[in-house]
Amino acid sequence: IKDTVFQTRPDVQVAYVGTSDLPTDTVTALQDALTPFCSDLNGDGRVVVQVDSYTVDFDAANESTDAYYQMAGVTRLSAELSSGGKTYIFLLEDPEGFEAQTGALQYLDGTVPDDPETTDADWREMVYRWTDCPVLAGLDLGDYTSDAVQNDSGSSQELLSHYYIGIRGAWTK
């Protein structure tokens, strides 16, 4: 009961979907840097941004993909998308593959494809590059160091500059 009562519930959830996890330093810096741009949506008196990681490789021809990690990532992502999950912001390594497999994104103008089951929507009109947003590109995210997930170190901004931002669509029946 204690864990349920005192559990921190995020106000904003961001889903990172890529072939490998982001470095812990980058995730922490991103959560901290986004917090001032968010509000206390759940009314608990705190603003909490949470970045959830989904390790998924949408390239079926990639033979170096670990089947167990792939299955776990796909299962978790599918559960989040199908259960009416709380994630609406996506940080994507492969936006084309993500949209083709999930059909979950809305267009940049806020409209959604006519049929969410149709995955031939133009994904380029549904995302923007991290570097195309001055606010995101200007965040002070510092550097990441090697850890259990990442073998190298470098600039978190440089790492994120290769990703795209997309927003989950909301369809009405």
Question: Where in this protein do the model-derived segments appear?
Answer:
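Solvent-exposed loop/turn segments at secondary-structure junctions
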Residues: 19-23, 95-99, 171-172
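Gram-positive cell-envelope targeting signals
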Residues: 1-19, 26, 30
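Extracytoplasmic/periplasmic substrate-recognition and gating elements
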Residues: 55-71, 79-89, 157-173
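Short, polar/charged alpha-helical segment
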Residues: 24-48
